[in-house]
Curated annotation (Swiss-Prot):
Cysteine pairings via disulfide bonds: none
Pathway this chain belongs to: Phenylpropanoid metabolism; trans-cinnamate biosynthesis; trans-cinnamate from L-phenylalanine: step 1/1
Protein name: Phenylalanine ammonia-lyase
Modification after translation (UniProt): Contains an active site 4-methylidene-imidazol-5-one (MIO), which is formed autocatalytically by cyclization and dehydration of residues Ala-Ser-Gly.
Native source organism of the sequence: Camellia sinensis (Tea plant)
Length: 714
């Protein structure tokens, strides 16, 4: 930023985030942050998440850095900018000097909130009382339920609070911030209550427990590096914080508790995952189009360019990239050309309008990400110490509305992604809609003893229902608090918590859906090989039985072969393959129908036994019944042993890295009723990998060749 256009706190580079006079309302900065593609932004987040150090200066913290500190623990170190020390010290000194001069300042010489009319000269005692009365949380120790904030969310809050206080507007000593960073770097996490904050005036109650640990309160506890419970003295020793517990100076207790760090810290974690899940939903939609034999024109750039929404345009371009050159798309095109007037002209909405559905949701998630990144780099306590103007400013930056609103919006977007996923899943397992895949995606030999993903569909309905409930807003449930002083409040942390729940449920859905898509990929592989076997067998039998008459002469039935093979091409394999020669299944019925139709056209020749096609039907069917079941079983066994005649098409597709990860690295396999392994066991593997971030690389590998633009309109 041009230093000539910034107003600082008058105390060095660490004392001010800078205020650009060329963009006084900050809209320019906000717009600049939205440039480029969402995918490139997510790639940048992942890269930053994996860095070994997070350097804090108060101005450049990102959600990926917060997520890294939250979940990677001691793998990532926190470093405080030394240049911020001067500004932090200046604001702390100003508070002490103003106290000594008798200046009346909120929370320094006054009571708090609705009782700020009270006055005291005992500034240190006032801070101690602030922490005591805010320690109002319930942990439920000794009960089955847990009411403790997850350690990851607490670590996120600690990092964000340090970042805010580093900017030098809060009147707190640098040494306290160093102590918090030592707790982070040594993986020592204070125990904070899960509930009890309305995120205005900040997250008072949970943050007071961080202050409680710093001051050595008897009821304060922390969790150590190996999960052990620590009392304050032991926590200080393990963290290497010297000098004993802190005796808070005037304003320092208020500086620690009067901020939005818990809500915005958790929101950062949530959004890091939501952004990745949004990209995953785009790729899963493309794989859905592949296994459903969808028509790829739904991704055509002109369609989306005419709609103007950037999220939609990018979603379509990503799907277009996955489908471009896909072996499934090429094969499906041939199928669509066969009897086109007997098939739907368009795919259903869950496939065809997936870019239009996902696009606005990605825009919402991206916008929320920027809003939360502004919040975690904001100074959000009260009062603010403006050293350069020699005054304390009484305002309301503790109001966490950006968090509540962003999280409500994100949760709605997450729920809508889940709704699309459920609609796609429902089509995938339904043999009325899935273009020839078996009902329930059953992969076994006997569908009467294999119900595939039926239980999974019920679970998906449960997930989706809960997710839709969570989509309801939190921010319209505000209650007037603290003697009507906090009469409007953001409910930021509550909304963040509910969004974290929603993201967790979307991960359950994504895991289940991805395993189902891999099942569908394998079933298409079975389908292709089995159809090839059936065609080969029918062709072989036709040549053997229908070509020659009893005396070696050419027989009229030899002309039936082409139509017989056309039946095999047109009939869904899984409609008959469990018992291919059954008279009640369509294959034998339609093969016979071909022979009957040819016989009816045979005219006078049909009256002659030596040229009658009717006379060939029994021999043809008997030969089919002799050969086909053996050939089908042989083909099944070959596929199961990895020796299929036709390789799996997925290996030729850009979606292959995701399939390969699920099948090879996670060790999942085709689910059938013949095997002991349950669907939930496979879903668990994928869910765990998704939670650990192990799916990020294969997901990004699917898109590594994308140049950030749609294909040209030709």
């Amino acid at each position: 930023m041009d230093s000539t256009t910034a107003i600082g706190n008058g105390v060095g580079s660490g004392g001010s985030p800078g205020f650009c006079l060329k963009d006084p309302l900050n809209w320019g900065v906000a717009a600049e942050a939205m440039k480029g593609s969402h995918l490139e932004e997510v790639k940048g987040m992942v890269e930053e998440f994996r860095k070994p150090v997070v350097r804090l200066g108060g101005e450049t913290l990102t959600i990926s850095q917060v997520a890294a500190i939250a979940v990677r623990g001691s793998e990532v170190a926190v470093e405080l900018s030394e240049s911020a020390r001067e500004g932090v010290k200046a604001s702390s000194d100003w508070v002490m000097e103003s106290m000594n001069k008798g200046t009346d300042s909120y929370g320094v010489t006054t009571g708090f909130g609705a009782t700020s009319h009270r006055r005291t000269k005992e500034g240190g005692a006032l801070q101690k009382e602030l922490i005591r009365f805010l320690n109002a949380g319930i942990f439920g120790n000794g009960t089955e339920s847990c009411h403790t904030l997850p350690q990851s969310a607490t670590r996120a809050a600690m990092l964000v609070r340090i970042n805010t206080l580093l900017q030098g507007y809060s009147g707190i000593r640098f040494e306290i911030l160093e102590a918090i960073s030592k707790f982070l770097n040594n993986n020592i996490t204070p125990c904070l209550p899960l509930r009890g904050t309305i995120t205005a005036s900040g997250d008072l109650v949970p943050l007071s427990y961080i202050a409680g640990l710093l001051t050595g309160r008897h009821n304060s506890k922390a969790v150590g590096p190996t999960g052990e419970i620590l009392h304050p003295k032991e926590a200080f020793r393990l963290a290497g914080v010297e000098g004993g517990f802190f005796e808070l100076q005037p304003k320092e207790g208020l500086a620690l508790v009067n901020g939005t760090a818990v809500g915005s810290g958790l929101a950062s974690m949530v959004l890091f995952e939501a952004n990745i899940l949004a990209v995953l939903s785009e790729v899963l939609s493309a794989i859905f189009a592949e296994v459903m034999q969808g028509k790829p024109e739904f991704t055509d750039h002109l369609t989306h360019k005419l709609k103007h929404h950037p999220g939609q345009i990018e979603a379509a371009a990503i799907m277009e990239h996955i489908l471009d050159g896909s072996s499934y798309v090429k094969a499906a095109q041939k199928l669509h050309e066969m009897d086109p007037l007997q098939k739907p002209k368009q795919d259903r909405y869950a496939l065809r309008t997936s870019p239009q559905w996902l696009g606005p949701l990605i825009e919402v998630i991206r916008s929320s990400t920027k809003s939360i990144e502004r919040e975690i780099n904001s100074v959000n306590d009260n009062p603010l110490i403006n050293v350069s103007r020699n005054k304390a400013l009484h305002g309301g930056n503790f109001q966490g509305t950006p968090i509540g609103v962003s999280m409500d919006n994100t949760r709605l977007a997450v729920a809508s992604i889940g709704k699309l996923m459920f609609a796609q899943f429902s089509e995938l397992v339904n043999d009325f809609y899935n273009n020839g895949l078996p009902s329930n995606l059953s992969g076994g030999r006997n569908p009467s003893l294999d119900y595939g993903f039926k239980g999974a569909e019920i679970a998906m309905a449960a997930y989706c229902s809960e997710l839709q409930f969570l989509a309801n807003p939190v921010t319209n449930h505000v209650q007037s608090a603290e003697q009507h002083n906090q009469d409007v409040n953001s409910l930021g942390l509550i909304s963040s918590r509910k969004t974290a729940e929603a993201v967790d449920i979307l991960k359950l859905m994504s895991s289940t859906y991805l395993v189902a898509l891999c099942q569908a990929v394998d079933l298409r592989h079975f389908e292709e090989n089995l159809r090839n076997t059936v065609k080969s067998t029918v062709s072989q039998v036709a040549k053997r039985v229908l070509t020659m008459g009893v005396n070696g002469e050419l027989h009229p039935s030899r002309f039936c072969e082409k139509d017989l093979l056309r039946v095999v091409d047109r009939e869904y394999i899984f409609a008959y393959i469990d018992d291919p020669c059954s008279a009640t299944y369509p294959l034998m019925q339609k093969l016979r129908q071909v022979l009957v139709e040819h016989a009816l056209k045979n005219g006078e020749s049909e009256k002659n036994l030596s040229t009658s096609i009717f006379q060939k039907i029994r021999a043809f069917e008997e030969e089919i019944k002799t050969l086909l079941p053996k050939e089908v079983e042989s083909t099944r066994a070959a596929i199961e042993n990895g020796n299929s005649a036709i390789p799996n098409r997925i290996k030729e597709c850009r979606s292959y890295p995701l399939y390969k990860f699920v099948r090879e690295e996670l060790g999942t396999e085709l689910l059938t009723g013949e095997k002991v392994r349950s669907p939930g066991e496979e879903f668990d593997k994928v869910f765990t990998a998704l939670c650990k971030g192990e799916m990020i690389d294969p997901l990004m590998d699917c898109l590594k060749e994308w140049n950030g633009a749609p294909l040209p309109i030709c």
